[in-house]
Each structure stands twice: as C-alpha cells, then as structure tokens.
C-alpha cells in the first residue's frame, strides 16, 4: 500500500472529481489511518479496526468514483458490489460472503500482475530461445561411433564442432532478425500447454459460482497437462511464449499468500445502493431482501472468517464504504447494529451549474478533453469557448432540474447530443479546426430547454 498524506490523497482526487471536500477528507483520513496502523506494534495493531464510511448523496455526484480512485491510488484490492444483488441465506440469490471472495480474486489478479511484470525480461529471453528453436527446428544430438572412440578418429569431432559453430551463428542471425521484426509475418509451428479444462458444473441452491470448492481447479491439478501444436505468425508466437514462460516463472503459492494478506489488510469493499435494503415503515412478514440481508452483512463488516477457494480470509481489517441516495429511506432506517458499524457519515451535495462548469474544465479525464482526443484521431482539432462550456453546463443543469436528477451523468447525454452531427461527419472533415461556440451549442441543443422535449435527453 502506497504511503500518501491526507492532503496528497485529496489533491489526487481533485484531479478527477470536482467538489465533495468532506467526502474526500473522510476517505483520505481512513486511508492514512491504515498506514498508521501498519506502524503499530503487532499486539496493538489487531485492536485498531478501520472506521467504515457511509456516503449519502444523490446519484451522479461522485460516490463511486471517489472509492474507485482511492483504491487505484493506493494500489489496494477493490471490489464494488450492489446491495440489491444479495438475498438472505436460504433464498435464491447471491450470498453476502461472495463480496469477500470477489475481493480475494481481485487481490490475486493484482499480485499476479505485479509478479508477472517483474519476470517480464527474463521470460522474454527464454521465450526468444524457444522461438528460435521452433524456427530452425531442434537438431537431434548424434551418438558417437564406438570406432571413433576406440581409434581416436578426429574427423567426426571436428565436423560436429564446425556444425555447432555454424548453428550458433545461424541462431544469432535469426535472433537479430526477430528483434528487428523482420520475421513477424513468418508462420511458425509451436508447442504450448493446453490450458482448457473440461467444463464441470454442479447445480446447488446457491448456484455454481457460490461453491467453496472449485472442481475445475481440482481436476486441472490432478490431470496431466496436455500439449498442443499451434501454427501462428511469429509476432503472435512471441506473445504466447512470453506469457507461458512468465507464468512458469512465478510461484502461485507465494502469489496467493500475499494476495490474502493484502485483501485482509488493504482491501476495500464498496457497497452501493445500501439504502435499497433499508426497511422503511412497517412491513408484515419476512423481509427477504432487506432486514435479512442487513443481518447477513453485519458479521462480515464486524469481522469474521470467510472460506474462499484460496483459503480462509479474515474481514476484521477490510475497509467498507457504503453509499446510497437515501431519498426514500433514511440512514436511521438501517438496523441499529449496522449503523454502528459505519461510524463515519458523509453527506455529498447535489451538483450546481458552477460544478458542471468545473467538471467540464478541470478533471484530467474531462468529457470535453475526451471528445477532443476522439476527434483528433480523424484529424479534427476541436476547441471550446468559455461561453460554450457555460452553455453546456446550463443545459445539463436545467434538464436535471426539470426531470430526474442524475448528476454529472447528465453531461454524457448532453455532450453526445452536441457532438452527434460532428462525429457522424468527422471522416469528411479531416484537417479542419472546429470551434464549439455558444451559438453552436444552442443550435444543437435548442430543444433541450423545452420541457416537452426533455424526454429526449433522459437516459
């Protein structure tokens, strides 16, 4: 886990997310506390648990993006789950343990990618030697003639040495051509490990995905690995062999051990739509998808051990970030025990016109910049006037006010409509510079302020 100060985390988040200072500060402090915990003595470290966060705010204001960005920033295993996908134990649907299994899978992928990067250069060298063998063909080593041994005949020895030198020269010549890309389109026959395994499915009331025992993995380990011959171009063979050799160089037991440790100590689980499992008002009979799910989630957030195919995983120090609009139910409608597991509560504000202007201008991945880059591939240079940016922001803001407020996601709809004609005609406009002005925006979006036409812009 990377070491960032809270201010540095907020500064990084500011590059992609506009406003919401309170939410950014909360997650920054939560991450810094994890770093502080790692510096504590082992006996005290176990006593410090993460301060889980619940974000309250309308859709499209940055709840999910904040969680995703911080996970990427500190290189922590991250998984996003929808609370509405889970049902109480015993009913059809995903059980809550699956969120921990998903987190471990994400951690394994992350650690494996890191290990593969470290062995890339070594794998390339081994793969190159293998590829040269396939191109020139493997030469069988000749057995020595017994008469040569008895009577010390030198001719065959010299012939073999000369042939060896010639072969070495040929290999170096091919190696140079490979590196220069001269043989890329040459078709070569290679032998690779067959990674496909027979499909085995077992149907239970939990569904095959929820089974703790992965039968395919078990049989893949028991059955001998088969080889298969493939005819592919050299550039493709290079990629296949490099990947296979890199896989052979990493120790999967070490990967799994590190992944479990990272998931337990650095993992972040983002539970979206948590307000949808809050019971509002009086409900008669069993509430399968609401209170039951809350009670099932409770032990995981509180800290328990979940069995995964990689081994047992403790959830005591996983950071949970929950989010919801809470426009129907309230946070207080969650069961008290669950509320107590989220000590940090943050309210995110709805976006204003000024926020929309900043969203279009400031982030590194702003939509305006995305459309500029997309059209640059066609040879078109797009520029915006300040008045045009303000007009786009105003249209998005007013549509949100007149219809369903979907936050910053509304900008996707407006920008797509704005660039519809330009994107369609782009291949014929190569080499031109297009300036998006206020008049152009008003012309393309002239119906957007008419409340009878607003439905066109609703996602």
UniProtKB/Swiss-Prot annotation:
Where is it predominantly found?
A: cytoplasm
This protein's GO cellular component annotations are:
HslUV protease complex
* Taxonomic superkingdom: Bacteria
Alphabetical UniProt keywords: ATP-binding, Chaperone, Cytoplasm, Nucleotide-binding, Stress response
What protein family does this chain belong to? Belongs to the ClpX chaperone family. HslU subfamily.
Q: What does this protein do?
A: ATPase subunit of a proteasome-like degradation complex; this subunit has chaperone activity. The binding of ATP and its subsequent hydrolysis by HslU are essential for unfolding of protein substrates subsequently hydrolyzed by HslV. HslU recognizes the N-terminal part of its protein substrates and unfolds these before they are guided to HslV for hydrolysis.
Q: Which NCBIfam families has this protein been placed in?
A: hslU (TIGR00390), PRK05201.1 (NF003544)
| UniProt-recorded name of the protein | ATP-dependent protease ATPase subunit HslU
Organism encoding this protein: Thermoanaerobacter pseudethanolicus (strain ATCC 33223 / 39E)
What would be the name of the gene that encodes this protein? hslU
């Amino acid at each position: 886990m990377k070491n960032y100060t809270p201010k540095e985390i907020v500064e990084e988040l500011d590059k992609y997310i506009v406003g919401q200072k309170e939410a950014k500060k909360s997650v920054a402090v939560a991450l810094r506390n994890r770093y502080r915990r790692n510096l504590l003595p082992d006996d005290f470290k176990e006593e410090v648990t993460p301060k889980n966060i619940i974000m309250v705010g309308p859709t499209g204001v940055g709840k999910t993006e904040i969680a995703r960005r911080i996970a990427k920033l500190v290189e922590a295993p991250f998984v996003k789950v929808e609370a509405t996908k889970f049902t109480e134990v015993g009913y059809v649907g995903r059980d809550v343990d699956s969120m921990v299994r998903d987190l471990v899978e994400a951690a394994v992928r992350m650690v494996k990618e890191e290990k593969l990067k470290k062995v890339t250069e070594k794998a390339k060298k081994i793969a190159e030697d293998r590829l040269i063998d396939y191109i020139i063909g493997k030469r069988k080593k000749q057995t020595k003639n017994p008469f040569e041994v008895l009577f010390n005949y030198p001719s065959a020895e010299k012939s073999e040495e000369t042939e060896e030198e010639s072969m070495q020269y040929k290999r170096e010549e091919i190696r140079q051509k490979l590196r220069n890309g001269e043989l890329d389109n040459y078709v070569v026959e290679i032998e690779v490990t067959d990674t496909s395994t027979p499909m085995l499915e077992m149907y239970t009331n939990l569904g095959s995905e929820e089974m703790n025992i992965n039968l395919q993995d078990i049989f893949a380990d028991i059955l001998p690995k088969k080889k298969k011959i493939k005819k592919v171009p050299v550039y493709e063979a290079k990629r296949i062999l490099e990947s296979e050799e890199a896989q052979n160089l990493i120790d999967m037991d070490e990967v799994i051990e590190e992944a479990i440790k990272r998931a337990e100590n650095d993992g972040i689980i983002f539970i979206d739509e948590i307000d949808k499992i809050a019971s509002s008002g009086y409900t008669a009979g069993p509430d399968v998808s609401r209170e039951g799910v809350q009670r099932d989630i409770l032990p995981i957030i509180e800290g328990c051990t979940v069995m995964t195919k990689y081994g047992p995983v403790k959830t005591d120090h996983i950071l949970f970030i929950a989010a919801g609009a809470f426009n129907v139910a309230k946070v207080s409608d969650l069961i008290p025990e669950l509320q107590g597991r989220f000590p940090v509560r943050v309210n995110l504000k709805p976006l204003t016109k000024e926020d929309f202007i900043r969203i279009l201008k400031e982030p590194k991945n702003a939509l305006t910049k995305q459309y500029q880059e997309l059209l640059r591939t066609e040879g078109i240079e797009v520029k915006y006037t300040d008045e045009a940016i303000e007009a786009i922001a105003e249209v998005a803001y007013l549509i949100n006010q007149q219809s369903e407020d979907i936050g910053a996601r509304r900008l996707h709809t407006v920008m797509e409509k704005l660039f519809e004609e330009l994107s369609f005609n782009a291949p014929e406009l190569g080499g031109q510079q297009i300036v998006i002005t206020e008049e152009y925006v008003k012309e393309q979006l002239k119906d957007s302020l008419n409340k009878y036409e607003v439905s066109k812009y609703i996602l």
